């Protein structure tokens, strides 16, 4: 029983490096090798946020030492940033960072999207965005809109 309690108390130290460093490192390597820029956005944003968290920790470490729950909060936040089902880093980028930093932005590969098209793409998972971006690059955005309308029409039938 003491072993389980010891693991529970140090859960952040056991899982943290894998969640906060190893998986993002692996995913960043994959993102660099992929032809699309959408996953680059997720991982570059993650590393920026992780760096800011680290700078924050180094700046106020004396205060954080008095907060026993800080490592667990950091772990949960980083899990939200990293896990593909949440894509928290991409969410933070699209909802906060992007509003203040616009440097000739386009969502991906050189195709300029309207704000409405960007919103539609941001609602999708990273893999779905990649697929739609590839489809748009091949066939154009009009074909995506036709496919969406056809799917809506089909769902109304059933």
Swiss-Prot record:
InterPro entries: TB2_DP1_HVA22
Main location, first listed in the record: membrane
Keyword annotations of the record: Membrane, Transmembrane, Transmembrane helix
Keyword Membrane: yes
Record's subcellular location: Membrane
Membrane-spanning intervals of the chain: 2-22, 41-61, 63-83
CC per GO annotation: membrane
Entry membrane topology: Multi-pass membrane protein
Pfam families from the UniProt entry: TB2_DP1_HVA22
Family stated for the protein in its record: Belongs to the DP1 family.
UniProt-recorded name of the protein: HVA22-like protein f
Organism placement in taxonomy: Eukaryota, Viridiplantae, Streptophyta, Embryophyta, Tracheophyta
Gene: HVA22F
């Amino acid at each position: 029983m003491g072993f389980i309690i010891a693991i529970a108390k140090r859960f952040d130290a056991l899982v943290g490096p894998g969640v906060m460093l190893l998986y993002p490192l692996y995913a960043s390597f994959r993102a660099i090798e992929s032809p699309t820029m959408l996953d680059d956005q997720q991982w570059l944003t993650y590393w920026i946020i992780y760096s800011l968290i680290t700078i924050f920790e180094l700046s106020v470490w004396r205060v954080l030492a008095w907060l026993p729950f800080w490592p667990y909060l950091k772990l949960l936040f980083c899990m939200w940033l990293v896990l593909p089902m949440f894509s928290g880093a991409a969410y933070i980028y699209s909802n906060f960072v992007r509003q203040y930093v616009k440097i000739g932005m386009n969502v991906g590969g050189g195709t300029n999207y309207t704000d409405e098209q960007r919103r539609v793409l941001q609602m999708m998972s990273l893999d779905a965005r990649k697929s739609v971006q590839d489809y748009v690059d091949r066939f154009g955005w009009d074909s995506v809109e036709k496919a969406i309308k056809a799917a809506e029409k089909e769902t109304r039938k059933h």
